[in-house]
């Protein structure tokens, strides 16, 4: 009788099949966890988003808009008058946010921008008292890649200012920020990070924006927009966010935001713009820091 040949096993064949199955299972598990995380974040963010959307819808009624914005201005504390070296009155650090009557606030483009900003804020890595994310930035000259903490020198504080030319509060308060640069640059470093446009001409358009700039499609577009800003802030270092918006994502910086970093730690985290973007809070922090270094200085009123 002929003997049947015994089955031959190829060494490693079963191991390779099991390895491939394990890789697929691991990938499926990671995708499932990511999906669950995104779903949970949407459930957390959705009530907040709905509240913002409802407020924008209300503000499209001009009578409500004028009443609410007027009441907000009246509720603000009286601004202390500051004089420059020539005895002239210095404009306030945080002029009130103005919204023209012809601007619609509750549109599909505005809701997309609001959702994008709230999502970045929810997933940001930066938190006050925690380590500062060393996210990637790009030099406008030569497109050389660097990192944010490359601009931190020793124990000196580093002030980060995120924004874009089409953001009215950011541009309205640039002169106040520039005054801080001039006054404290001996002991403090400052860095402007140009991020995606807040109100691009092909997105959420506002007539209050001083410039009409479309959303950036390339680094060249972002450089062109940043050059406009650089003319108004010649004394401050300026870099670009990457086209993947790595710095804006890490710091939750859209529409605009302020941070202070010292020794790799976030010492101050400003609120999200427009309402939370307060140059006066940075000034207060720097005044306290300056007093620690040099003692209290007399203030002229």
Curated annotation (Swiss-Prot):
<dbReference type="GO" id="GO:0042403">
    <property type="term" value="P:thyroid hormone metabolic process"/>
</dbReference>
<feature type="topological domain" description="Extracellular">
    <location>
        <begin position="65"/>
        <end position="301"/>
    </location>
</feature>
<dbReference type="GO" id="GO:0042404">
    <property type="term" value="P:thyroid hormone catabolic process"/>
</dbReference>
<keyword id="KW-1003">Cell membrane</keyword>
<keyword id="KW-0893">Thyroid hormones biosynthesis</keyword>
<dbReference type="GO" id="GO:0033798">
    <property type="term" value="F:thyroxine 5-deiodinase activity"/>
</dbReference>
<dbReference type="GO" id="GO:0042446">
    <property type="term" value="P:hormone biosynthetic process"/>
</dbReference>
<dbReference type="GO" id="GO:0097474">
    <property type="term" value="P:retinal cone cell apoptotic process"/>
</dbReference>
<comment type="function">
    <text>Plays a crucial role in the metabolism of thyroid hormones (TH) and has specific roles in TH activation and inactivation by deiodination. Catalyzes the deiodination of L-thyroxine (T4) to 3,3',5'-triiodothyronine (rT3), 3,5,3'-triiodothyronine (T3) to 3,3'-diiodothyronine (3,3'-T2), 3,5-diiodothyronine (3,5-T2) to 3-monoiodothyronine (3-T1), rT3 to 3',5'-diiodothyronine (3',5'-T2) and 3,3'-T2 to 3'-monoiodothyronine (3'-T1) via inner-ring deiodination (IRD). Catalyzes the deiodination of 3-T1 to L-thyronine (T0) via outer-ring deiodination (ORD).</text>
</comment>
<keyword id="KW-0712">Selenocysteine</keyword>
<dbReference type="InterPro" id="IPR008261">
    <property type="entry name" value="Iodothyronine_deiodinase_AS"/>
</dbReference>
<dbReference type="GO" id="GO:0004800">
    <property type="term" value="F:thyroxine 5'-deiodinase activity"/>
</dbReference>
<dbReference type="GO" id="GO:0010008">
    <property type="term" value="C:endosome membrane"/>
</dbReference>
<keyword id="KW-0967">Endosome</keyword>
<keyword id="KW-0472">Membrane</keyword>
<keyword id="KW-1133">Transmembrane helix</keyword>
<dbReference type="GO" id="GO:0046549">
    <property type="term" value="P:retinal cone cell development"/>
</dbReference>
<keyword id="KW-0560">Oxidoreductase</keyword>
<dbReference type="GO" id="GO:0005886">
    <property type="term" value="C:plasma membrane"/>
</dbReference>
<dbReference type="InterPro" id="IPR000643">
    <property type="entry name" value="Iodothyronine_deiodinase"/>
</dbReference>
<dbReference type="Pfam" id="PF00837">
    <property type="entry name" value="T4_deiodinase"/>
</dbReference>
<protein>
    <recommendedName>
        <fullName>Thyroxine 5-deiodinase</fullName>
        <ecNumber>1.21.99.3</ecNumber>
    </recommendedName>
</protein>
<comment type="subunit">
    <text>Monomer. Homodimer. May undergo minor heretodimerization with DIO1 and DIO2.</text>
</comment>
<feature type="active site">
    <location>
        <position position="167"/>
    </location>
</feature>
<dbReference type="GO" id="GO:0040018">
    <property type="term" value="P:positive regulation of multicellular organism growth"/>
</dbReference>
<feature type="transmembrane region" description="Helical; Signal-anchor for type II membrane protein">
    <location>
        <begin position="42"/>
        <end position="64"/>
    </location>
</feature>
<feature type="topological domain" description="Cytoplasmic">
    <location>
        <begin position="1"/>
        <end position="41"/>
    </location>
</feature>
<dbReference type="InterPro" id="IPR036249">
    <property type="entry name" value="Thioredoxin-like_sf"/>
</dbReference>
<keyword id="KW-0735">Signal-anchor</keyword>
<dbReference type="InterPro" id="IPR027252">
    <property type="entry name" value="Iodothyronine_deiodinase_I/III"/>
</dbReference>
<comment type="similarity">
    <text>Belongs to the iodothyronine deiodinase family.</text>
</comment>
<keyword id="KW-0812">Transmembrane</keyword>
